[in-house]
Design a protein with these regions (language model features):
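Conserved, well-structured interaction surfaces
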Residues: 13-89, 124-127, 142-151
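TPR/Sel1-like alpha-solenoid repeat signature
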Residues: 74, 162-165
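Short, contiguous alpha-helical
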Residues: 86, 165, 169
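Short coil/linker segments at helix-helix boundaries
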Residues: 87-132
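Extracytoplasmic ligand-binding clamshell segments of periplasmic binding protein
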Residues: 150-158
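Aromatic-residue-lined binding/catalytic grooves and analogous aromatic/hydrophobic interfacial grooves
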Residues: 159, 168-173
Length: 173
């Protein structure tokens, strides 16, 4: 009478975000906590690879396709760092003291970062991440994408860049 499809079982892969909700398997001994970090830095690497491949020394020499790809890469990288800073910045609170990490965000990895540098790349100050990566990337994306229109809601547009700038300014002002 009891077919296996009717049996009540444990976790079969559905709702794997529940681990965050129940605060299970998030310690240093589990891979779940590293998923977000690893995904974001893989996406940053992809953006860095595009930035590295397109000569951005003079935007005027780029054709429309190169400008849009480079603009997308800068916008995505800024968005990824904006998310990472908000996720990993230690916030002052009444429950935990952590003076050693107050004001620190995440490591900055740029196209020119070597493998040796990446192996010993400490967390950067939050202000430095905004000043060295987020705002400059958004300014470049705005310049490269100015006058363009997105063909659909899935493509980065100047409006999205302005929205990211607004979020960044809200955080820093």
């Amino acid at each position: 009478d009891a077919l296996p499809i009717f049996a009540i079982g444990g976790n079969i892969g559905y709702d794997w975000f529940a681990q965050w909700g129940t605060n299970e398997a998030l310690g240093a001994d589990y891979a779940v906590g590293a998923l977000t970090w690893n995904n974001y830095y893989a996406w940053i690497m992809a953006a860095n690879n595009v930035i590295k491949q397109i000569d951005a020394s003079d935007f005027a020499t780029l054709d429309a396709t190169q400008k849009s790809y480079l603009g997308f890469a800068y916008a995505y990288r800024a968005m990824f760092y904006l998310d990472l800073v908000r996720l990993y910045e230690f916030k002052e609170n009444n429950y935990t003291e952590a003076p050693g990490v107050l004001g620190l965000g995440v490591p900055i990895v740029l196209p020119e970062t070597t493998e040796a540098e990446a192996k010993n790349n400490p967390r950067a100050k939050v202000d430095d991440i905004y000043d060295q990566v987020i705002f400059p990337d958004l300014d470049k994306a705005e310049e490269l994408l100015s006058g363009s229109t997105a063909p659909d809601k899935y493509t980065i547009s100047p409006a999205l860049v302005y929205g990211l700038k607004a979020r960044a300014w809200l955080k820093t002002s």
